[in-house]
Amino acid sequence: MKITRRHALQGTGATALGLAGLNFDFSRATAQTNVKRGGTLNFAISAEAPHYDPHASDTYATLHLAGPFYSTLLRFNLEKFPQVEGDLAQSWQVAPDLMTYTFKLKPDVKFHDGTALTSADIKATYDRLRNPPQGVVSTRKATFGDIAEIQTPDPLTVVFKMKAVNASMLEHFASPWNVIYAAKDLSADPASPRTKINGTGPYTFVEHVKGSHVAGKKNDGYFKKGLPYLDGFKGIFTLQAAAMLNAVQGGQVMGEFRGISPAERDRLVQAMGDKIRIQESSWTLALLVCFNIEKKPFDDVRVRRALLMAIDRWGGSNGLSKISTLRSVGGVVRPGSPFATPEAELVKLPGFSKDIKKSREEAKKLLKEAGQENLKFTLWNRNLAMPYTPAGIFLVDQWRQVGVEVEHKQSDTGAYLAHMNSGNHDVAIDFTNLFMDDTSLGLSKFLSLSRSPENRSRSNDPQLDKLYDDHIRERDVEKRKALIRAFEKRLFEQAYQQQLLWWHRIVATHKTLMGWQMSPSHNLGAQLEGVWLNA
């Protein structure tokens, strides 16, 4: 079985597909004949971004703050997810051998400072993503490492030449993290996007008041005529779940676009009745148990495997799904998606046995062999109620049952990420934050630290790197699936890090909020260009 249908569409027919995406944008804008223009959308953001640069981030807080100010080359059509459509791209062609991607840009696009967008800006942005200069972090460096050269034959044409095939490269060009920066800004200061915003998106930056809110106003020069509908928006930081729920219930905010727990959903429905809209979906997001293998005793695979084997994921799923956004047991691929490991195979992997008594006996044996019968350590965690706090409490209890004593420490998002990124943690609750199910994205987090800054276990494993590289080149589905299984087996046997549980997304919005679209990823739809208020 070959991956042919999709790439046939993306090859010689890709230009037509690109134009269809363009037409879809405008038909969507004009089909809503009853749209009410104007007004300011107030919405909640449950964490504050550590900086403004999506290239260097893997937390939704950055996108929910900065997303409305930026555009990307392509994006996902949320009504037909995971189909891609043009954002800055007017059309595109993909060579049959998948080694050349040619994009034609929409004309008359301007950055918020009045500078005209050209192919040079696309090149500068993707050069920064694939080969960041010293002092700049690109968490997608591994993803775009297959780009050999970027050509700009004219101001509205950009050509990507590949070193090797990546069967999912077109979808990566639609990543919401790949916002386009101005070449002149990057030339003046490659690190400037961390603290300054100059995009081409539907809203222009007004202010960011730390601890309070971020505000944007309508971009009157937006290249998509008739959009956005709103006069502006205010993203209000509500770091405590109770405060966020009170704000939704009281009408101070129209919703929160990440997700809430089942109990929080039930509270809002009971209090607000038919005034609240509830949308639910499986989620391309999982929590991870992550060991820093540079710290003793976590440099010993026996200790790491023992701690994973002590966790009753199946029982935990049943309990945690009632009180948090955690739900599904799964491996490196989202449960239910095409490349997910079937349950019958998953239970054979370390940490996924349904016989928890036997598994914990083996865990105690491994700890004894490693001389760690009285192990004590600190679990580093994020101070978000959903679902980090219940996950941390759950893990502390699980490890207690094999004689391990754990101190549970939580901090806000900025400090949490800085602590892990600098390698100061012993064990942490990390996350895999995906915008699609494709494994070229999902597995990249687990590559060697030298290739992937997102790898907070700090492991370097050439065997995993080779399996990853082989799988992204493979166009035969069954062969690719086998490589994914081998990658997963190696990762879990070495126990560098492992999925705890996958999430379930529940979003609550006021019914007066229109045009917002649900998806399996809270990283998508952050531009807010099609949102309007029926009030």
Model-predicted segments: where are they?
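Structural transition elements
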Residues: R327-L366, M386-Y388
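N-terminal lobe/hinge region of extracytoplasmic solute-binding protein
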Residues: A44-P96, D127, K196-G199
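Gly/Pro-rich hinge or "lid" segments in bacterial periplasmic/extracellular proteins
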Residues: R75-E79, A174-P228, G232, Q240-A242, ...
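Acidic-aromatic pocket-rim loops
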Residues: S57, G273, G331-V332, P338-F339, ...
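Extracellular/periplasmic solute-recognition and catalytic clefts
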Residues: F26, E149-Q151, V206-K217, K234-K295, ...
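Long beta-strand-rich cores associated with HINT superfamily self-processing modules
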Residues: V507-A535
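Extracytoplasmic/peripheral linker and loop segments enriched in polar/acidic and small residues
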Residues: M99, I356, E405-Y416, L443-K511, ...
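Surface-exposed binding/hinge segments that line
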Residues: K104, S138-D185
